[in-house]
Amino acid sequence: MAATSIIQQLFNSCDVATVGQFSGSHSLAAVGSTAPITNLFITIFVGFSVGANVIISRFLGAQREDRANQAIHTALVLSVITGFIVSVIGEIIARPLLEMMSTPTEVLPLAVLYLRVCFIGMFFLTIYNFESAILRAGGDTKRPLYCLIISGTINVVLNLVFVILFKLDVAGVALATTIADATSACLLFRILSKEEGALQVRLDRMKIEWIYTKEILIIGIPAAIQGMLFNISNIIIQSAINSLGADIVAASTVAMNFEMYTYFLITGFAQAAITFTSQNYGAKNYKRCVQSIRWCMLLGALFTGSVSALFIIFSPVLAGIFTSDPAVVKIACIRISIVVAFQVINMTIEIMSGALRGLGNPMISTVLCIVFTCALRLAWIFIVFARIHTFESVLVVYPVSWAVTASSIVIAYLVVKKKKLIM
């Protein structure tokens, strides 16, 4: 799962590098200024797909294959509905939201164009995430990876064709991503239709079963809300960064690529925690629940810490892949040294939240994130940044909010563990 997320980010980095090297800093800033918005919408359907993953895993762990299959078909119908709604809303609010975020005027038209094309692809990306969640629930993480490699390769090739050959600039990159997302969704649907047993998908079985919809939403809505609130706070932070000028926006775009590598590595272990915990909890194997969470934390810390260290050490060289502007590279290294250095703390939040969802307590981490992450970040921007108007003062909010939130979620997990797993 971590490999899948990292490869996905690798292809995203190719998008950014193509724009940065062949279209310039303004195009790079345009792509980067939209990131919190696209992430906001992605977290909506990822949250719902987490709900599907938990419910399907629980049925499979309890050996209720008939119910698992019904939940799968319900989840796929939900993915189509969710994807359509996200795409339509995104098209409507793209420009107003970018204007509200104080996007620099010199990059605003490019940012609007890029975002609107991306929202077309959100429909396919939603379906892909649900399909991937279904296969993960059955313990299959390889085939989503293979499909991603195929679609990602198509994405990279089309990037070069659209940007270098046809001079489509940011629209070319967004169009390439949309085509790649559609490819991956179609490939995974074909795989599921060829499955045997509980995971087999058939068009004539596609319908919403309200009993499973309710269970998916009970888990999925809190996960979606948690992700949305994180990203709303990130939109406020991006607005603060936008006010500092196009070079800093471009530099943040470069640095965020490396943050996303570590974050997707983290979410791989968080998804593992959700799947293993929910399966073993469904099978009433409480000892293995605890062991799974411990291993996810240990391996997550090892890999996240190692990758973060490499990014910090080689940050000037790595940032230079995305842009040849020395001023942008220098600023990007500042963000990497402050934010990436503390991703291990963020790892604790994600894995512990995943464990709580797998144990059937999705609201706990959501409430704690609202109180200790989102509210703190908003207060920081409106109080601290308003007085100390520098790039560094914006960035410090990340490790501070992570540390406070992680402490509260660990305490919550220990309380739930004592009640549910120690018997």
What residue ranges belong to the model's regions?
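Transmembrane alpha-helix boundary and packing residues in multipass membrane permease domains
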Residues: 1, 5, 17, 54, ...
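Small-residue-rich hydrophobic transmembrane alpha-helices
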Residues: 28-88, 125-144, 251-315, 346-369
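Helix-loop interface residues and adjacent transmembrane-helix termini in multi-pass membrane transporters
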Residues: 10-13, 22-25, 59-62, 137-138, ...
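Transmembrane helix-bundle signature of multi-pass secondary active exporters and lipid flippases
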Residues: 2-54, 118-125, 214-279, 300-308, ...
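Transmembrane alpha-helical segments of integral membrane proteins
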Residues: 375-385
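Short alpha-helical transmembrane segments in multi-pass integral membrane proteins
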Residues: 56-121, 154, 165-221, 277-342, ...
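Short runs within selected transmembrane alpha-helices of multi-pass transporters and secretion channels
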Residues: 49, 117-136, 144-152, 173-186, ...
